């Protein structure tokens, strides 16, 4: 038995129905939140794959630094004019993994070489400025890379890989 006046105004029963439904929705969302949020990667996982920025200004000509990105060592070399000229004078066809120096550096920033510092033979960490080619020398099995990170001698099958990177400014790069 409803009258016209009670249909326009909500009853106490309507209020309790809406309040109970809202409380159940909030409680259900609060109960489900931990299950949904645990599917997201944690902060260390996100940070491990995140791009990193490296300031190049403290690296003197002829020096290298090693940084880590995604758990891998990255060598950043500030090459001298002599190293660049020697790398470009190499007959690319004579290399085990033919690749020109120009293909391994960014145009306009030829003095900077950025490579992943893991030997392509068995995964050892090469030493910078060692070996016969003033590049990288793998102490495990003797692979020798030139100043452009190209394999020149030894059992390694390929050049040191170049990670994805870009110049943010003249003195800063972003790796990743």
Curated annotation (Swiss-Prot):
Give the enzyme's main class according to its UniProt record, as a single word: translocase
Positions of the Rieske domain: 87-174
The topology of this chain with respect to the membrane is: Single-pass membrane protein
As recorded in UniProt, its EC number(s) are 7.1.1.8
Question: Has keyword Repressor?
Answer: no
- UniProt keywords, alphabetically: 2Fe-2S, Cell membrane, Disulfide bond, Electron transport, Iron, Iron-sulfur, Membrane, Metal-binding, Translocase, Transmembrane, Transmembrane helix, Transport
Q: Which CDD domains match?
A: Rieske_cytochrome_bc1
**GO molecular function: any one?**
ubiquinol-cytochrome-c reductase activity
One Pfam family of this chain: UCR_Fe-S_N
Q: Where in the cell is it found?
A: Cell membrane
**Catalytic function, reaction form:** a quinol + 2 Fe(III)-[cytochrome c](out) = a quinone + 2 Fe(II)-[cytochrome c](out) + 2 H(+)(out)
Bound cofactor: record note: Binds 1 [2Fe-2S] cluster per subunit.
Q: Where does [2Fe-2S] cluster bind?
A: 119, 121, 138, 141
InterPro entries to which the protein is assigned, alphabetical? Rieske_2Fe-2S, Rieske_2Fe-2S_sf, Rieske_Fe-S_prot, Rieske_Fe-S_prot_C, TAT_signal, TAT_signal_bac_arc, Ubiq_cytC_Rdtase_Fe-S_su_TAT, Ubiquinol_cyt_c_Rdtase_Fe-S-su
Q: List all membrane-crossing ranges.
A: 15-36
Q: What cofactor does this protein call for?
A: [2Fe-2S] cluster
Instruction: Specify whether Transport is a keyword of the entry.
Output: yes
Cystines in this chain: 124-140
Q: Which NCBIfam families match?
A: Rieske_proteo, TAT_signal_seq
What's the stated role of this polypeptide? Component of the ubiquinol-cytochrome c reductase complex (complex III or cytochrome b-c1 complex), which is a respiratory chain that generates an electrochemical potential coupled to ATP synthesis.
The entry describes its oligomerization and partners as: The main subunits of complex b-c1 are: cytochrome b, cytochrome c1 and the Rieske protein.
Additional observations: The Rieske protein is a high potential 2Fe-2S protein.
- Can you name this protein? Ubiquinol-cytochrome c reductase iron-sulfur subunit
Top-level taxonomy: Bacteria, Pseudomonadati, Pseudomonadota, Alphaproteobacteria, Hyphomicrobiales
């Amino acid at each position: 038995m409803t009258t016209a006046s009670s249909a326009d105004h909500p009853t106490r029963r309507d209020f309790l129905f809406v309040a109970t439904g809202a409380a159940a929705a909030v409680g259900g969302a609060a109960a489900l939140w931990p299950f949904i949020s645990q599917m997201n990667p944690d902060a260390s996982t996100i940070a491990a794959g995140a791009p990193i920025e490296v300031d190049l200004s403290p690296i003197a000509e002829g020096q290298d630094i090693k940084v880590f990105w995604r758990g891998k060592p990255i060598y950043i070399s500030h090459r001298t004019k002599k190293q660049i000229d020697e790398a470009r004078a190499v007959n690319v066809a004579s290399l085990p993994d033919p690749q020109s120096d120009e293909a391994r550096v960014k145009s306009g920033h030829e003095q900077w070489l950025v490579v992943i510092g893991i030997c392509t033979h068995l995964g050892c960490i090469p030493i910078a400025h060692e070996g016969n080619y003033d590049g990288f020398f793998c102490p495990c099995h003797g692979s020798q890379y030139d100043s452009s990170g190209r394999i020149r001698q030894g059992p390694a099958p390929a050049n040191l890989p170049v990670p994805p990177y870009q110049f943010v400014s003249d003195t800063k790069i972003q790796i990743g």
